[in-house]
C-alpha cells in the first residue's frame, strides 16, 4: 500500500473514532457538581455563545461547553445550591421555523434533557427564574459570556453582562461574584476523556507538520503551505485550525503573531509554522521552524540550537509541584547565556532602558537585553481554548498532574529590533556593540513549540514532530531524493 493510500485510509477512519472519544454525560454532571461544591449557597448563571454575526462558523464558549456539552446558540445554564443540595436547569430558545431552514432544526427539549442530564426550560423565563432566586437572598455567581482570555469582550456589555446589570438594578442588594476563577481552576486538570480528544488534535497537528516538512520548497507562497496544513486538519475529521495559522518566512519569521501568510518563500529562508488542529473542541498548538531550502545556514543553525537547548531546559524542570517561576527562569538563563555567546547582547545579565520600563518594577526580566529577543511568554495551557488554564507564563503557581500545556521558546532577530529603543546612554552603548551582530543574524526568527501533559511521574511530550536539526534536514533530503 502506498503512503498516499495509507494516509487516505487514516483520514477516512478518523472521524468515526473522534465521535467515540466525546466527553460522557456523567463527566459533565461531575464538573457541575465540582463547581457547586465551591459554593456554600448561591445561584450560578452561565451564558453560552449567541448566534454569530453573518454567515460565520459558530462555536460554543469554552466555559459553557465545559459545564454542559451543549452545542446550540443562545442558551443559559442556572445551577442552584442551597441546603447542601444542588440542581441545574438549561434554558434554550426555540428556533424560528424560517430560520431553521437556514441553520437546521434544533433538538427538542426532551432530547436535550436526555443528552445533558439537565432540566430544560425556555429561555424567555430565565429572567423570572433568576429574579425569584435573587429575591430570596441567594448570591449570584456570574459566568459571563466571553472567552477566558478575551479581554476585548470583557470590556463590553455582552448579553450576559446586560442580564447581570439589569438584575442588579432590579435587586440593588444582591451580591454578585465572578465564577470564572472557579471554573478555570477546574478546567486546568484534564480528564482521561479530555486527553484522548486532545491527543487526537495534537496527533493530527503533528501529521500536518510532517506534510509541511515534505512539501515546502522555494518559490512556494506562505498561504499555499497554510492550505496544505489546514487541509490535513479537515481531511482528518477535525473542525479546522484552533487559531489563525501563522506561516511566516524570512522577515515574517521574526513577527510573533504574523497572520498575513502572503509572502513568497525564497531559498535561504526559514519558515515558522505555528499551527494547531481543533478536534472535538480541543485545541492543539505546535510550532516548527524549518529551512525552506532544506538545510539551515550557519547563523540559522546557531539560533535554532540555542532555542532547542532552552526548550530542553524547561522540559527538565516541568514536573508535578515544580514552580512556574523556576520553569521560566531556566529557559531565560539558557537563552541569555547563548545570546551573549553569539554577541547579540553585551552579557548574560546585561540590561537596557526599555519602552516598557514600568514592567521592570514587577519583574526585572523585562529590562534584560535578552528579553528583546523573546518578549513573549514561555508557554500556556491548552484545552478548550488554545490559551486554556493554567497560565504558567505569569504568576507564582506550580505544575499539577493533569496540566496540559505548551513550551514555546523563541529567538527573533528583526531588522527593526534596535529601532524601538529610546536614545539613552545605556542603549547607545548596547547598540554600538551589538548592531553588527544583529545585522549578521537579521531576519532569522526561530520558535519551537510542543504540547505536554503533567503526569504523576513527570511530563509527557505529546507532539512528536521532527524537531532536531538532523531530523529536519534528513526529512528534507529524503523529499528531495524522492522528487528526482
Task: Describe each region flagged by the PLM.
Residues 11-20:
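Hydrophobic h-region of N-terminal signal peptides that target proteins for export
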Residues 20-484:
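Active-site neighborhoods and metal-handling regions in enzymes and metal-associated proteins
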Amino acid at each position: 500500500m502506498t503512503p498516499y493510500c495509507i494516509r487516505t485510509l487514516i483520514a477516512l477512519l478518523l472521524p468515526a473514532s473522534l465521535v467515540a472519544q466525546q466527553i460522557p454525560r456523567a463527566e459533565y454532571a461531575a464538573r457541575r457538581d465540582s463547581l457547586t461544591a465551591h459554593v456554600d449557597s448561591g445561584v450560578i448563571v452561565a451564558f453560552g455563545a449567541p448566534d454569530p454575526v453573518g454567515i460565520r462558523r459558530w462555536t460554543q464558549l469554552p466555559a459553557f461547553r465545559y459545564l454542559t456539552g451543549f452545542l446550540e446558540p443562545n442558551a443559559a445554564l442556572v445551577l442552584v445550591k442551597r441546603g447542601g443540595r444542588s440542581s441545574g436547569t438549561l434554558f434554550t430558545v426555540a428556533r424560528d421555523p424560517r430560520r431553521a431552514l437556514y441553520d437546521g432544526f434544533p433538538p427538542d427539549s426532551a432530547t436535550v434533557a436526555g443528552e445533558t442530564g439537565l432540566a430544560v426550560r425556555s429561555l424567555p423565563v430565565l429572567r423570572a427564574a433568576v429574579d425569584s432566586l435573587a429575591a430570596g437572598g441567594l448570591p449570584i455567581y456570574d459566568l459571563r459570556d466571553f472567552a477566558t482570555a478575551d479581554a476585548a469582550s470583557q470590556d463590553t456589555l455582552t448579553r450576559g453582562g446586560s442580564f447581570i446589570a439589569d438584575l442588579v438594578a432590579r435587586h440593588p442588594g444582591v451580591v454578585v461574584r465572578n465564577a470564572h476563577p472557579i471554573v478555570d481552576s477546574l478546567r486546568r486538570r484534564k480528564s482521561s476523556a479530555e486527553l484522548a480528544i486532545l491527543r487526537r488534535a495534537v496527533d493530527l497537528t503533528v501529521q500536518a507538520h510532517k506534510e509541511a516538512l515534505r512539501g515546502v520548497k522555494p518559490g512556494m507562497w506562505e498561504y499555499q503551505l497554510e492550505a496544505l496544513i489546514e487541509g490535513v486538519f479537515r481531511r482528518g475529521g477535525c473542525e479546522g485550525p484552533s487559531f489563525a495559522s501563522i506561516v511566516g518566512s524570512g522577515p515574517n519569521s521574526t513577527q510573533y503573531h504574523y497572520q498575513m501568510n502572503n509572502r513568497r518563500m525564497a531559498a535561504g529562508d526559514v519558515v515558522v509554522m505555528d499551527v494547531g488542529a481543533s478536534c472535538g473542541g480541543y485545541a492543539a498548538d505546535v510550532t516548527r521552524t524549518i529551512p525552506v531550502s532544506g538545510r539551515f545556514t550557519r547563523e540559522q543553525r546557531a539560533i535554532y540550537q540555542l532555542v532547542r537547548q532552552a526548550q530542553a531546559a524547561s522540559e527538565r524542570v516541568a514536573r508535578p509541584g515544580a514552580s512556574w517561576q523556576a520553569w521560566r527562569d531556566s529557559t531565560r538563563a539558557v537563552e541569555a547565556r547563548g545570546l551573549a555567546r553569539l554577541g547579540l547582547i553585551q552579557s548574560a545579565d546585561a540590561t537596557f532602558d526599555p519602552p516598557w520600563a514600568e514592567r521592570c518594577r514587577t519583574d526585572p526580566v523585562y529590562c534584560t537585553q535578552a528579553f528583546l529577543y523573546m518578549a513573549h511568554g514561555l508557554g500556556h495551557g491548552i484545552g478548550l481554548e488554545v490559551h486554556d488554564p493554567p497560565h504558567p507564563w505569569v504568576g507564582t503557581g506550580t505544575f499539577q498532574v493533569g496540566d496540559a500545556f505548551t513550551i514555546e521558546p523563541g529567538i527573533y532577530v528583526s531588522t527593526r529590533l534596535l529601532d524601538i529603543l529610546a536614545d539613552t546612554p545605556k542603549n547607545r552603548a548596547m547598540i554600538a556593540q551589538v548592531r553588527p551582530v544583529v545585522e549578521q543574524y537579521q531576519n532569522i526568527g526561530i520558535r519551537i513549540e510542543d504540547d505536554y501533559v503533567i503526569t504523576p511521574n513527570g511530563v509527557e511530550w505529546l507532539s512528536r514532530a521532527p524537531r532536531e536539526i538532523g531530523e529536519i534536514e534528513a526529512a528534507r533530503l529524503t523529499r528531495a531524493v524522492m522528487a528526482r
